[in-house]
Regions:
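A structural signal for short loop-to-beta-strand junctions that line the ligand-binding cleft
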Residues: 1-27, 53-55
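Short beta-strand->loop
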Residues: 15, 135-151, 160-163
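Short helix-loop capping/hinge motifs at secondary-structure junctions, enriched
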Residues: 31-40, 73-79, 163-169
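Short loop->beta-strand "edge-of-pocket" segments that line small-molecule binding or catalytic clefts
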Residues: 44-59
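Mature extracytoplasmic/periplasmic domains
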Residues: 160-220
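Conserved C-terminal helix/tail region of periplasmic/extracytoplasmic solute-binding proteins
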Residues: 108, 216-246
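Ligand-binding pocket segment of bilobal, Venus flytrap-like solute-binding proteins
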Residues: 56-60, 64, 68, 76-142
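A bilobed periplasmic-binding-protein/Venus flytrap-type ligand-binding module shared by bacterial periplasmic
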Residues: 26-31, 70-73, 153-165, 184
Length: 246
């Protein structure tokens, strides 16, 4: 995470990490077995024609393009118009398989057994796992980080340089960094904590939950989303409009 945060705070001087997570694939093991499909391991698996009507994609420009770009071996922060066009065309090709482009609804639709596969953020997994257990569902919802790579996101606290109450802001951040408080926040919002002291307070089953705290090897191809400038943003926006319009 320290390496990842240098993407927006090169000297680690200004931002204090609060939560973090990644983008991955959630799948219903029973439904995939019924369809005769092996569990996904790569983004490219989301182009399997047998998933027609069974796929939930993120209704988010950079998330959708992360999938199509990394599938092709490109950086998810590419500024190359040709690579963006290739990713756009792949997303258009994929559209007949997509049941819906959604965001928060992926979680509830997958719990309800409405789809076989969904693209989701890792921070939803603890809630999902608890719901599957409490509802006594006869299928499992498993999370995988695709082999090609993904993005890591880090929510941080910073104090603006023109803050009128700088001392109070620092006290607030210090309070949130207390291990006991960071642990409570993790248990409430369920997105992974970067706080080592809070992590040490967690039960072993949470510490060993690879959906929430993956092994570093599984993040070796991960990147952090970067702001690419207005001109490149326009390229992505126009490409996404074409995807949605098809």
């Amino acid at each position: 995470l320290q390496m990842a945060s240098t993407a927006f705070d090169p000297e680690n001087k200004y931002a204090v990490p609060y939560t973090w997570g990644d983008l991955g694939i959630l799948y219903n093991d029973k439904r995939l077995e019924e369809l005769g499909i092996d569990p996904p391991t790569k983004w490219s698996d989301l182009w399997d024609e047998r998933l027609s009507g069974e796929l939930l994609m993120q209704d988010s420009i950079r998330s959708a393009f992360t999938i199509a770009l990394t599938k092709n071996g490109y950086s998810l922060n590419t500024t190359n118009p040709d690579e963006i066009t290739i990713a756009k065309n792949d997303l258009i090709t994929q559209k007949p398989l997509v049941q819906a482009y959604v965001i928060d609804q992926v979680r509830d639709k997958m719990i309800g057994g409405e789809a076989a596969v969904g693209v989701i953020y890792s921070g939803e997994m603890l809630y999902i796992q608890n719901e599957v257990k409490e509802l006594g569902l006869d299928y499992n919802l498993n999370y995988v980080l695709p082999e090609e790579g993904t993005y890591i996101f880090i929510d941080c606290w910073v104090v603006p340089k023109n803050a009128k109450h700088k001392e109070n802001a620092e006290k607030w951040i210090n309070f949130l960094c207390r291990p006991d408080i960071a642990k409570k926040n993790f248990e409430y919002i369920t997105y992974s904590t970067p706080n080592k002291g809070a992590f040490d307070l967690l039960d072993a089953d949470l510490q060993n939950n690879k959906a929430l705290f993956p092994d570093i090897d599984n993040l070796k191809n991960a990147e952090v989303l970067q702001y690419l400038g207005d001109e490149v943003d326009d390229l992505y926006n126009e490409a996404w409009k074409e995807v949605k319009a098809e």
